[in-house]
């Protein structure tokens, strides 16, 4: 399983973000998942970038539609104690700890552009792409 965070997905969509080409990450048979939080984070990132003029008006809906087409399963059952423990151990936000907890629980890889989350995932033995 590939767990994707909002920074990775935004990197696929926004100019100059330096994200990996999704075609190199997405294996046809590999399921993709994210915590439920991705739904709000992605939309917020896109709207803020629209407001700042980084992306044209009207692109937000098209970008969301494209991401929804990837079939990302949104997880709604995180381990509360596990998330808190990861946040404390690695000094992560609870938001970032949600992504790491899902990757650990699913025994999956994690796609992120966030340096702190990358370090925490590597420390926990999670492969980062």
Q: PLM features: what roles do these ranges have?
A:
Residues 1-37, 49-62, 124:
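Short, well-structured N-terminal submotif of metal-dependent ribonuclease cores
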């Amino acid at each position: 399983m590939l767990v994707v965070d909002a920074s990775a997905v935004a990197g696929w969509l926004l100019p100059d973000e330096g994200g990996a080409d999704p075609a190199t990450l997405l294996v046809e048979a590999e399921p993709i998942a994210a915590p439920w939080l991705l739904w709000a984070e992605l939309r917020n990132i896109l709207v803020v970038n629209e407001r700042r003029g980084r992306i044209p008006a009207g692109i937000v809906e098209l970008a969301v539609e494209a991401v929804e087409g990837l079939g990302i399963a949104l997880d709604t059952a995180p381990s509360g104690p596990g998330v808190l423990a990861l946040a404390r151990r690695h000094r992560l936000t609870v938001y970032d700890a949600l992504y790491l907890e899902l990757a650990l629980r699913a025994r999956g890889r994690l796609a992120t552009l966030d340096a702190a989350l990358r370090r925490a995932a590597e420390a926990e033995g999670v492969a980062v792409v």
